[in-house]
From Swiss-Prot:
Extracellular side: 25-1044
Signal peptide positions (record): 1-24
UniProt similarity note: Belongs to the protein-tyrosine phosphatase family. Receptor class 3 subfamily.
Species: Gallus gallus (Chicken)
CDD domains reported in the protein's UniProt record: FN3, R-PTPc-J, TM_EGFR-like
Regions crossing the membrane: 1045-1065
Name of the protein in question: Receptor-type tyrosine-protein phosphatase eta
Catalytic activity entry: O-phospho-L-tyrosyl-[protein] + H2O = L-tyrosyl-[protein] + phosphate
Location of this chain's protein in the cell: Cell membrane; Cell projection, Ruffle membrane; Cell junction
Tyrosine-protein phosphatase domain span: 1110-1367
EC number: 3.1.3.48
GO biological process, one term: negative regulation of MAP kinase activity
Domain Fibronectin type-III span(s) in chain numbering: 82-170, 171-259, 260-343, 346-437, 438-523, 524-614, 615-703, 704-793, 794-888, 887-979
Gene Ontology MF annotations: phosphatase activity; protein tyrosine phosphatase activity
Amino acid sequence: MRRLPLLPPCPLLLLLLLPAEVRCTTACTDDCSLKNVTEEMGTSSNDELSVNATSGNRRLSEDVSLPGRAMSDQNSVAQPRAVLDLKTEYVGVTSVNLTWTVNDTASDSYTYRIEVRNGSSINNKTSDITDAEITGLIPGTLYTFTVFAVAADGQTAGEGASISLYTKPSPVLDLKAEYVGVTSVNLTWTVNDTASASYTYRIEVTSDSSIDSLTSSVTMAEITGLIPGTLYSFKVFAVAADNRTEADGASISLYTKPSPVLDLKAEYVGVTSVNLTWTVNGTALTAYTYRIEVRNATSIRNETSNINKIEITGLIPGTSYNFKVFATPVNNTTEEEGLSLNLYTKPSPVLRVVTEYVGVTSVNLTWMVDDTASDSYTYRIEVRNGSSINNKTSDITDAEITGLIPGTLYTFTVFAVAADGQTAGEGASISLYTKPSPVLDLKAEYVGVTSVNLTWTVNDTASASYTYRIEVTSDSSIDSLTSNVTMAEITGLIPGTLYNFTVFAVAADNRTEADGAFTSLYTKPTPVTDLKAEHGVTSVSLNWMVNDTASDSYTYRIEVRNGHSVNNKTSNIPETEITGLNPGTLYTFTVFAVAADGETEGEGASISVYTKPRAVLHLKTEYVGVTSVNLTWTVNDTDSASYTYRIEVRNGSSINNKTSDITDAEITGLDPGTLYIFTVFAVAADGQTAGEGASISLYTKPSMVLNLKAEYVTMTSVNLTWMVNDAESASYTYRIEVAHESLINETMSNVTKSIVTYLIPGTSYNFTVFAIAADNQTEGEGASISQNTVPSSVNAFQCEAVANMSYLTLKWNCPYGGYSGFDIEIFNGTWTKKQQSQFCGREGSEEIFKTEPLDYYKTYTVSVTTVSDGLTSLPVQKICKTSITDPPVPNKAPLVKAVSHNSLSVEFPDFESVNGPLKAYAVMIVTEAEGCLPSKSDLDYTYNDFKQKMTATYVTYVIDVEEISSSSHSQNGHNIVDVGKGNTMYGYENGPLIPLHSYRASVAGFTNINFTVANKIMGEQSYVSFSPCSEVVSLPQDPGVIAGAVIGCLLAILAVVAIGGYIFWRRRRKDKRNTEVSFSPIKIKKSKMIKVENFESYFKKQQADSNCGFAEEYEELKSAGVHQPKFAAEIAENRGKNRYNNVLPYDISRVKLSNPSCTTDDYINANYMPGYSSKKAFIAAQGPLPNTIEDFWRMIWEKNIYSIVMLTKCVEQARTKCEQYWPDKQSKSYGDIIVTMVSEVVLPEWTIRDFNVENADTMESHTVRQFHFTSWPDHGVPETTDLLINFRHLVHEYSSQNPIDSPILVHCSAGVGRTGTFIAIDRLIQQIEMENTVDVYGVVYDLRMHRPLMVQTEDQYVFLNQCVMDIIRSQKEKKTDLIYQNTTAMAIYENFTPGPAFGKANGYHA
């Protein structure tokens, strides 16, 4: 096929000349139509042309002169320039739109002329603006357009601008297909334009997949090479002679014929439909439609399809049909010859295929068919089992299928077959399982409480796919469950219940069941729960619980197992008692609940228990220690070899357990001194089952006491202290064993201290302290300490000078108790000499000791201390003077001067008095010129002996030192004696000397001078020394006798005075009893000293007539001391410090406080009182007033007081007798003194308090003990003498250890009555012990000289004498020390311990 040449697309220039609104908006393959064409021009040259202005909304039109018409002349104007940019905005069939530009400034006044030239034809158009539409043109014709700008004069035109172009041809007419083939089409058309002879034609062929162009120079064209059955668009364009300017296209669309269909077949033959398919070789087959002619014996109809297949529906099932297919393009008019196919439709599927019967190896099937052609049908039954397929046939609508496998899935498909014997309808299928065979050997492999395990067998070949339904039936329920295997665990059953189990084999469809196999049984009862055993010795009580709903029908079997022995018991209720068992033996009790059948038992619930062992026997302690106890016991049980033993150790709420494998145990880790209850339980071999406990209660031994010390040792007591760290020590008592040689005594204490009394002084004791637990029986190990008591001081100590010897003779009575010797200490100032005495006789015998030589006439303090094993007694002191002896011989001779013819003066210094005071001097005259050596024998010679020539040496004058007048001494202390005066002194005459004789003088000095009855000096019995003889003095001649006589008289007077003075001096020395010098001038003026052995008769005498004698004595004492001054007490500032106006302290003995800020601050109502051995042994004071408490404590501190004796209650008979001056609990400050009560022991008759007293300024402190006697009424006396004597002993024992300068402070209310009685008792007891004499009167007198009203009442005075009487009587009864007989009071007090601040005083424990 020849293809015409294609025309070029629309020229680009043409497009640019067109206005924007009329440009082709697509490629020039479609219509290039022009818009705004106002008129389509004809081809006649006579048509009127018009010019339309396309800008400014103005339309200009004018008649145009015929071509060649001349223009009239105008005024000459400037020629416009040629227009620029002349172009076509639009080219149409009969019109053209032109545009141009003008750059002239006068262009606004321009008009424009457009010259239109076509060959020889010229037309003119005008325009006021720069564009113009030229209409009335001839289609497809060449035109030249020249535009001239014309000035405002309308005549002057510029150069013309030209453009040449063809108008578009007119579209072709009557375009049609003369022939349409499978791959080609013949087109024809017509054209009416006058210029058509010069036209060529472009045919544009467009399909969905391509665009082609071809050309033709005539008005027809054959288009070849097309695709069959394809829709094509054919568009024909007339093209002007320039081969560029095209007319608008004329179009026609059509299909090429399809290719014939091929390979027609039925893809699917259905019951009422057939699916046909075919092929077509044309490439445009997707655009085909197909007509299918459907023909059967009675009818014809057509179906169409847009694709190469179709489903023909609405057919009659099982009927013969002829199907013919025609391919038809989209226009449904072009067809080729059809292709035919003959076939039967399928019969309809059979309906309601059901099984009338399903058996183990056969199935009966039935079905229905509704087709009108069904009478000609036969039926094929396909029997499928897995991959095995068998076919059965039937001419009717039912069939029995036999020879099947049990329990197997079969699919039975029934096909209706048409009359051709081949075309079968869709199969109607039914799938089912044949029944499985019934299960075999159904049995219960396991019967549980809530479950049963069933097993069975199945011999079917399909049994692997079986499941099994187990129907479980009881009286109250029916349940089903399934199993995939030939066994099943049936759970959730009710214990102890009868169940029927039916097992059905179920085919794999889970529906088809075999006939059931049946078994019946009881589930096991639930094991009993909460099985408990009450242990007995030979029986066990069991009880249990069963929660099963069927438990009312249960019985119970109890299996009793002991080793290899098994017994069974039964019970109808959930409890039982098993008897006849062995003690302490392991039994396993297994309880089985038995269902109502009497055979089905639940699992046994077991409990293994031991019977209780019998209680242990003979529990006892083999040993009780501090932290351990050894227990033993016996057990008679036959199984006791396997027993262990639990020992429960109970201590209050604390319980611990110990174990033992044998019948004894050591329990350790106990607390000392603690009550424990030990309960021993025999425990069976299980380690848990215990028999009844056997108990024993006991205390562990307390620990041995620690730090046992003798804190305070006296003659008859030892204060023991110790510590106990035991937790239970608060409940302990303590036994103190006091051992001396073979004698052992005991005492008890409730605290960790004890004062052991009634000891023998100076004796070694072994003190063993045993802590005793609260049972008062269990003792700890004793802690021992050996301690010697302080030995007793010697009694009746006397110190005597030995005449004319320098040593002293000491005498004392051997003390009570033991001792190893005596230390004798002799000291004078800083000089001290110590000696020892080792021996003493029996108690009370006198010991005499001679000291080593001392200085003559020296006052020594001699102290005798009893020594015993390093301890010493309180020293007994005496102040003694050694004897006087001859005075030392003077170094110088006397100075002798002649006074007259018969007298001379002898001047000599005093002899040294170191060997005794000089008592007298004897002036001796020696008449021999040579050999002046006076001797004691010369003292016997007198002046008369000299005159009688019996001696050359004589005593001329004796001077009594005490009688020397002041005139007898010169101012330089020398003595001057005038010899020869003729006076007489004692038995010596101071006779005149012989004138003109020579004399020498010597002076004899006497420390002791004794005279004969004749007043002659006893030389051998006197202590005398002689001075060297003086130089010889010669007397002058005698001036007269008268002078000698005068001197003799004077000497005689002097002798008398000397003798009188000497006698007075001797008497005074004899009367003086106490060598101590009082601190005051008070001297005892009266006393009634009575020996102890005479006191009883004296007492009875004074006691007669209602104590008349004592009353007289007491009356005599009333005036004692009352005239002594009390100025300080009477000062106005001090009156408020006195409790009573009639009890004021004497100035001479009052206690003065130190550091007074004013003169009255030193005052306190208190006096120093003499004791037996010290003038300041006591301070007697009134009870403090509120305003004097600070002064009271200030006195205690300043006077170094360690002991206070309080003899009154604070309030008596509703009257305040004394302020409470001590704190109860907290420390309290009294001025600068801080007082803290350390301890308080309250006893029936007295209270003992210890205070710590501290000076806030110096921070020094010491302890003060207060002895508060509470059983002495004011102005009265205690009930018994023993009570006061014992109390005095208590105070004395303590205070004897105080510092030696520490007085005892005694007070009651006024500080006179009870206070005086107590001080007097102390002095009298010591006087009895030391002197074996009694002076009650003298003691009271002495006290009253120091403080008024001491021993205030007659009753108190009589009471003092009664005390003395009782003391003496007790001595006679061999109770040597009454003070040791306080069996009641001291037993109470013996555990009281001094406060912690007590240390040592003077080497003794305090």
